[in-house]
Structures are given as C-alpha cells and as structure tokens.
C-alpha cells in the first residue's frame, strides 16, 4: 500500500464551486483543518508500517511566503506519522508558463513576489 496525495495549494487555483473543496477554504486554518480531515479519511485505510506521500508547494501572498508545504507536513506529524523524507522537486518551465519567462519575471519584479520553481514531496510512514 502507498497513498499519494496532491492537494490544492489552498486557494491559488479554484477547482470547483463546491464548499467542501479544499481550494475554496476561506482561511489558512480552515484549509489545514479540512486537509487534516482528508488525511484522516484517507489514511484510515492505510495499514500500519505502510507509506504515504504528500506533494505540495508553498504560496506567496501579501509580499511573503506562506510555507503551505510545511504546514501540511505538520498535519501528518500531529497524527503520529513519521517523516521519512523531504524531496524537493525542481521544475523550470511549466505548461502554463511556457515561453513566458520574461513576462513572469517582469510581473514578479513589479509586483514584489517570488516565482516558485519547486514543490515538496513529503514521505511519511504510518506507525499507529
């Protein structure tokens, strides 16, 4: 058994109009509480000593980094999972930004934000 989760990065992209959709969470705490419920509802089927991965990146808002990946990592740790690895997946050009590096660089400089080129893959072991 191996569970892979790739949740929305909070409200960066809206996936639906459903109020239960994680991407429609109004606050960071609401998002994390809801993600915690997803962990509980999913990993209850995962047997002891099996593994789970969470693929997620961070968010940039109000001129600061919101370490969403590490907040989500903590949701697993609070539930007794062991953190076995943190992998950093680097990516250069995504399909949505292909051949548009110049405009994104300009937007980042003029609007005071950072262009992320990575996301995390957290590997956990269920021990309870």
Model-derived regions: residue spans:
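Class I S-adenosyl-L-methionine-dependent methyltransferase catalytic core
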Residues: 1-128
């Amino acid at each position: 058994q191996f569970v892979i989760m790739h949740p929305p990065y909070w409200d960066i992209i809206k996936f639906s109009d459903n109020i239960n959709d994680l991407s429609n969470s109004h606050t960071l705490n609401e998002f994390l509480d809801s993600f915690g419920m997803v962990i509980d509802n999913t990993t209850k089927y995962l047997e002891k000593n099996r593994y789970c991965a969470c693929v997620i990146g961070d968010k940039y808002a109000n001129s600061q980094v919101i370490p969403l990946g590490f907040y989500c990592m903590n949701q697993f740790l609070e539930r007794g999972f062991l953190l076995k690895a943190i992998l950093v997946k680097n990516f250069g050009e995504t399909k949505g930004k292909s051949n548009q590096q110049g405009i994104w660089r300009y937007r980042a400089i003029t609007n005071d934000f950072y262009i992320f080129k990575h996301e995390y893959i957290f590997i956990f072991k269920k021990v309870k």
